[in-house]
Amino acid sequence: MAYPSTHKLTVVHVSAHSPSIGASPVAEYLRVPFRCSIEKLTAVANGSITTADCSIAVALNGAAISGSPFTLPVAGAGVGQVASMTPTAKSYANEDDTISFTPSGASGANIPATFTAVLKQA
């Protein structure tokens, strides 16, 4: 059994849900609740994409976050498939900034997904 990793109270996970990352992708947005650094970005598929990988561009107030886009691969696609990215350079955000997740490239009808940003209070 794996041991759970503990997170300090200064680390918060904020999530948004997209109704489709497949043939008709829908971008989703998160409001940043406090001054922070962006530690990790993840996507969890709630269905199986087909044909091609899903590329997920992530931006802070419209500017790409370093290391973006990341990929949810079609290989092994299925419900609960997780893809994640750690920014290649520190990215800092202020309260009320916006983080956007823009999926593209995958196919399959109405494949929902949940996007999460792991934020560490400054």
Question: At which residue positions do the language-model features occur?
Answer:
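Short, charged beta-strand/loop "edge" motif centered at a coil->beta-strand transition
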Residues: 23-30, 44-46
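Extracellular and analogous surface-interaction loops
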Residues: 27-37, 89
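A short beta-strand element within beta-rich, extracytoplasmic domains
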Residues: 36-47
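Exposed beta-strand and adjacent loop surfaces of beta-rich binding modules
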Residues: 38-40, 53-55, 69, 112-114
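Extended, low-complexity, turn-rich repeat/linker tracts enriched in Gly/Pro/Ser/Thr and Asp/Glu
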Residues: 45-53, 105-111
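Cysteine-clustered segments with highest specificity for TGF-beta superfamily mature ligands
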Residues: 93-105
